[in-house]
């Protein structure tokens, strides 16, 4: 497996579209999925490949001069639990080391959907801590959990 930072905006959008199409349990709302695809064109993106086969990606978005956020991350279902997400996370952290103090991610709070409960466990496994829940940031059915990790 190799992880590469992708520079071409159309390639970024194609990568995000392909991976998110494989993850409807997490990315099943067409408008928000399209927003991730469109926004990825302008964001730093790392992709994981096995030879030429796309496995997953992660995008990054600066939120302040001390914090950057995992904007979107996805690994195709067939490749879950094989260390790809952790490898993407590691590549991301290497690239932000010395530039930011904190890395954050937003996800749906625990206890609402099994898929997002698994997402929380993944982020905890790579060192993220639960910071705060915003019960209605997205809507009342999807309370937003903010998780953070010190990377400075």
What do the PLM-derived regions correspond to, one by one?
Residues 75, 81-94, 118-121:
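Conserved acetyl-CoA-binding loop-helix of GNAT-fold acetyltransferases
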Residues 43, 142-146:
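Short hydrophobic/aromatic beta-strand or adjacent loop that forms the aromatic wall/cage
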Residues 1-30:
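Short amphipathic alpha-helix that is part of the acyltransferase structural core
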Residues 47, 53-61, 69-74:
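Conserved beta-strand in the GNAT
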Residues 110-132, 141:
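Conserved active-site alpha-helix within GNAT-family acetyltransferase domains
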Residues 66, 138-143:
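Short acidic/glycine-enriched loop/turn segments that link adjacent beta-strands
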Residues 66-77, 104-106:
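Conserved acetyl-CoA binding element of GNAT-fold acetyltransferases
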Residues 96-111:
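Conserved GNAT acetyl-CoA-binding A-motif
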């Amino acid at each position: 497996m190799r992880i590469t930072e992708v520079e071409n905006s159309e390639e970024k959008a194609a990568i995000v579209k392909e991976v998110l199409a494989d993850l409807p349990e997490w990315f099943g709302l067409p408008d928000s999925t399209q927003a991730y695809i469109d926004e990825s064109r302008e964001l730093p993106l790392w992709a994981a490949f096995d030879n030429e086969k796309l496995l997953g990606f992660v995008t990054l978005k600066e939120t302040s001069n001390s914090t950057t956020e995992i904007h979107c991350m996805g690994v195709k279902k067939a490749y879950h639990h094989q260390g790809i997400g952790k490898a993407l996370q590691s590549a991301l952290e290497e690239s932000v080391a010395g530039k930011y103090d904190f890395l954050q991610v937003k996800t749906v709070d625990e206890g609402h959907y099994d898929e997002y409960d698994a997402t929380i466990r993944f982020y905890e496994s790579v060192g993220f801590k639960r910071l705060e829940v915003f019960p209605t940031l997205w809507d009342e059915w999807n309370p937003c959990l903010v998780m953070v990790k010190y990377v400075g």
